[in-house]
Amino acid sequence: MPIRIDKKLPAVEILRTENIFVMDDQRAAHQDIRPLKILILNLMPQKMVTETQLLRHLANTPLQLDIDFLYMESHRSKTTRSEHMETFYKTFPEVKDEYFDGMIITGAPVEHLPFEEVDYWEEFRQMLEWSKTHVYSTLHICWGAQAGLYLRYGVEKYQMDSKLSGIYPQDTLKEGHLLFRGFDDSYVSPHSRHTEISKEEVLNKTNLEILSEGPQVGVSILASRDLREIYSFGHLEYDRDTLAKEYFRDRDAGFDPHIPENYFKDDDVNQVPCLCWSSSAALFFSNWVNHAVYQETPFDWRKIEDDASAYGYL
């Protein structure tokens, strides 16, 4: 699909070399259609990398998407230049009067902290509450999924004995589900986290559907029946080398990390890591945009609040 983003965003040139269509405002205006408005709350430290990863996977249907990036005013990024944030990102006050068809909340490297000790927690809480009436479908990823479940349902996260890092199999549990249209019975995806949730808590505290799970990863993807809330604990958006970079970063910092499982051939870190989830990632993000966002969101954004009330979100 054509994605509308600032043509000066560094991701643009990378995407164009991959033959991904990026549209400027002038050309978009000539199409005379309402684009889907997507808001990305990017909490990852390497923001430009995450921008490219997500935009690559969002560019997979013929729909036109208008992308905005959001950052936390209450947190200062140590790994991304302030000029980049000021140029390409908006703050919550700048978007709070707008409505969005979809929103992505990324992971964040703060899972070692209790939720309330994260420096931007109060701002995050306000954004999630706002999203109930201003966003139709929200896709939460990794820590973003754990935080969303905690705020909405009181589902806790629990420290694992060791970091879960690697490429793991998961089974799809709801045959024909719209988010998994085109999937086989099982698929693989990257996971990279120190914490997990309890399946029992999900079943007892929420009315969400568990859509996929695996023996090593546990619950992987769950969603509300109306697809307004989607929680994914893996990282389908990751590049081939993302887990490798995380491993070498931690090793060089002296943390003695485990080699990511099912990733390097023969666990030899000098080998090129496998890329065996890209087709699943393309399907998943395309299904989210088409079936959870495009097919369901009201043409008049103001009706999102009416839908939120009708479905018990308020």
From Swiss-Prot:
The keyword Zinc does not apply. Pathway: Amino-acid biosynthesis; L-methionine biosynthesis via de novo pathway; O-acetyl-L-homoserine from L-homoserine: step 1/1. Substrate binds at residues 163, 192, 249. GO terms for biological process: L-methionine biosynthetic process from homoserine via O-succinyl-L-homoserine and cystathionine. It catalyses: L-homoserine + acetyl-CoA = O-acetyl-L-homoserine + CoA. Keywords: Acyltransferase, Amino-acid biosynthesis, Cytoplasm, Methionine biosynthesis, Transferase. Coiled coil: none annotated. The active site is at 142 (acyl-thioester intermediate), 235 (proton acceptor), 237. The record marks 192 as: Important for substrate specificity. GO terms for cellular component: cytoplasm. InterPro entries: Class_I_gatase-like, HST_MetA, MetA_family. It is found in: Cytoplasm. Its main location: cytoplasm. Disulfide bonds: none annotated. The record marks 111 as: Important for acyl-CoA specificity. It holds the Pfam family HTS. Its EC number is 2.3.1.31. HAMAP family: MetA_acyltransf. Belongs to the MetA family. Transfers an acetyl group from acetyl-CoA to L-homoserine, forming acetyl-L-homoserine. This is Homoserine O-acetyltransferase. The gene is metAA.
